[in-house]
């Protein structure tokens, strides 16, 4: 007859703290693992799962309709005609940095409708 999981849990819950520590050490030696490493690995992915809140909008290329893209850049950034033209011609260039996801997506959509190639990072 084999021991069930419930029987093991009952036996461990009846042990003193020192006995549990010794049991853990014995299990680490027997199976060649470390309980501390398992805890650290389990905590790692949770930090990586944090959602990004600030995005950068990068103009990668102006496309065929450069005039429409310049107008869209002027409207989105408030730059003058010359500054917007210089920015579009120097692509790839950052249009806006540290904006919300909704603002970044809206800007990307308006620029792509004008014919530009845009990336949100």
From Swiss-Prot:
Gene Ontology terms: cellular component: cytosolic large ribosomal subunit
Gene Ontology MF, one: mRNA binding
Changes after translation: Acetylation of Ser-2 converts L12 to L7.
UniProt modified residues of type N-acetylserine: 2
Gene Ontology biological-process annotations: translation
UniProt keyword Lipid biosynthesis, yes or no: no
Superkingdom to which the source organism belongs: Bacteria
Record key words, sorted: Acetylation, Ribonucleoprotein, Ribosomal protein
Function: Forms part of the ribosomal stalk which helps the ribosome interact with GTP-bound translation factors. Is thus essential for accurate translation.
HAMAP family: Ribosomal_bL12
PANTHER family associated with the record: 39S RIBOSOMAL PROTEIN L12 (PTHR45987), LARGE RIBOSOMAL SUBUNIT PROTEIN BL12M (PTHR45987:SF4)
Family under the similarity heading: Belongs to the bacterial ribosomal protein bL12 family.
Quaternary structure note: Homodimer. Part of the ribosomal stalk of the 50S ribosomal subunit. Forms a multimeric L10(L12)X complex, where L10 forms an elongated spine to which 2 to 4 L12 dimers bind in a sequential fashion. Binds GTP-bound translation factors.
Name assigned to this protein: Large ribosomal subunit protein bL12
Gene source species: Salmonella typhimurium (strain LT2 / SGSC1412 / ATCC 700720)
